[in-house]
Amino acid sequence: MRRAMRVERKTEVRNGIKRGVFALFAIVVELIWVYIGLRNLTGEYSWIPFLIQGLAFVLVLGIYGRHINAAMKMPWILLIAGAPFLGVPLYLLMGFNGSTQRMRRRYEIIDEHLFPAMPQQGGILEELESVDYGIANQFRYLSDRLGYPVYRDTDICFYPTAEEAFEAQLEALKKAERFIFMEYHAIEEKTAFERLFEVLSERAAAGVEVRLFYDDIGSIWFIDHDFIRRMEEAGIEARVFNPMTPIFNAFLNHRDHRKITVIDGKVGFTGGYNLAEEYFNITHPYGHWFDTGIRLTGEAVRSLTGIFLENWNAIRGEKKDAEKLEEYLRLPSYCAAEPGYCQPYADSPLDGEQVGENVYMNLVNHAKRYVYFMTPYLIITDEMSQAFCLAAKRGVDVRIITPGIPDKKMVYQATRSYYNVLTRAGVRIYEYTPGFMHAKQCVADDELAACGTINLDFRSLYHHFENGVLFYRYRAIAKMKECFLGTFPQCREVTEQYLYGRTLFQRAEHCLLRLISPML
């Protein structure tokens, strides 16, 4: 078994740290100011406590009656009932925030142009229904409910390491002729990005349109405020998603966790890795970093292009750009080597649909022989937990690989708090002992798989912008299964001895963490 590598500390960009710390400090001060202000007003106006208590009662009833997951309700109900002077204003600020409503409207405007520009080709779903009606229903959910087409003429290549995926990505980028679109949660201006920047700047100089889109909080510690200017000087148009501000804004909770590269609308990459050192094991802050990726070639890349353009345009709210989507969304002429079915999809916290969770639950619920998952976090709803347990109880071989070395200790303990109920039902859980498991993928019954950015945790499933690819009957699925089978021997399987060995303090800690898990 491979030894865990020496833990190394990341190098952080100083001004990014200052900006992040200042913004967080300012937001905390604002919330404290609201709390103290309400408290002070109670001394002048005796009716204010009754108003707050009345609002607390109404809000608790309203939250309880909302058609959302029960785990999302409980923390708010306890906070509002237990500390109404804090919980009531905080919930009102979060729930009735104008910025979130404005962003939701922007996405609706973009989608009015986006989805008509990439319609479902006729006959594909009907053909899939004749092959396997149950499988077709899983694809039909994403197609009929959300508008993401199913494609045939697409080849898929699976990369069992982020290093292999990145090298293939660099080679493909060097061949770009029309445009390059890249969207990532985290960028670090070090060795890996320098290699990428060299290719991007060279293609930009050759007349290729290059766009780079990144999440501000995901990258805030690793790039400085001059990053966009430097990109523009090299001919690269860069935009930042949802910048961190010192003013309280509920939309700040929603981050862009997507990882997409599109080249000329013909080749696309996605997977778990960002553009930072640890993802390619250049540094080792958490032992060996395990990540994977996939390459799409052919028609399905159109949907990856559309997913990128949705965020790119919505963040600026530029309607004129939305009307030009068609020129980037033409189907490429491509004849695939494999007769599989491929469906890229995205998840948004603004549409009220838990797409990532529903795709995973469909995979688990329809598995007949086995279903395997890799995820860095395992913080799930009761519904997802029950799906895993029921599958195991009906004889499906359910296995989940989680990290052996955590990147966030509290989240790691929250992950472990779910082990007991799952393993008792027959789910087999493995911890990747050499380091941090960051891959987000699933394979079932040798024929169906999903790979992308979506973790098995509340933040990915409910709060972030995510993307993935669902695919059926590809050789890449066998490669993905080999990846699982090669990883299990490197893991420590969670056993009953481990579960019953928990101390009373650990049990209490796990109960508390499960209660607040929707906020982690």
Which sequence ranges carry the predicted segments?
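Helical hairpin unit composed of two closely spaced alpha helices linked by a short loop
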Residues: 367, 377-398, 403, 408
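Short, solvent-exposed amphipathic alpha-helical segments in soluble enzyme
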Residues: 387-391, 417, 485-486
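Glycine- and other small-residue-rich loops at beta-strand/loop junctions that grip anionic moieties
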Residues: 185, 376-377, 411
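CN hydrolase (nitrilase-like) catalytic-core segments centered on the catalytic cysteine
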Residues: 414, 426
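Thr-Gly-centered strand-to-loop micro-motif
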Residues: 374-375, 402, 432, 451-452
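Catalytic-core elements of nucleic-acid end-processing and repair enzymes
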Residues: 440
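N-terminal localization/anchoring segments of enzymes in phospholipid and broader phosphate metabolism
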Residues: 1-358, 362, 366, 406, ...
